[in-house]
Amino acid sequence: MKDTITIDGEVYETCYSIPSDNTVIWRFMDLAKFISLLKDSALYMTRADKFEDSFEGAVCSEEDSERYDEALNEYYSDLFEGKVVPEKLIEDEHKANRLLRMNSYLNCWYEGKHESMAMWRLYASGKEAKGVAIKTTAGQLKKAIGRLVEIGRIDYIDYSKEWPNVNEALWRKRVSFEYEHEVRIRISPKAGLSYNPEEFMMLSVDLNELIEAVYVSPMAESWFKTVVEDILEKYNVEKAVHHSRLDSKALY
């Protein structure tokens, strides 16, 4: 799905769907990342090529590379009215995609009205289970950032059936990751594209605008909630802390 954004009075079509301001989103993280967020008043933006998922920013699988290049060749051939397409043009397309991937910094959120057990297990599993989630809305996130950045939904696709173009690649993921219901922020360096960019960037935020409430892992011990409350107090952030509702006792 696509939407439009307005920049300096000009309307541009996006290659992603933009969540409405009242869309509920969550940021799940371990305690260290939570403390870093509070200490720096900034979101940690990971470079796209540093994610564990090797398909982050990919246009196709390696085994489909020949077919992908043939499709590119066909596209440019039509564009050039049947003239021979220089090999360099195809190479430049791949270089442009790798450069954009290397200069894109991402921060990922989960979209949903309720908590996700799958996300808790990703970020707060193990013996200590010291995980934290921030609940907010897309509108609050925009206000907290205070400047224009790209915020959009991920579209989950089957790479054996469709390939994203260079602009779409960072807004597409494999269908196996659909459980993430991801909304992401993307920024690029202000200085422009570089072949030697920083490994991460920090995006300043207003914490009181950003955080609606804080939740602690359903696997965490009861004392952990008090620890999180003390940490918030230390950084002068007055927000409610809840123990995850997924730990409620069942009646049979």
Mark where each language-model region is:
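Partner-binding and oligomerization surfaces adjacent to conserved cores of proteins
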Residues: 1-252
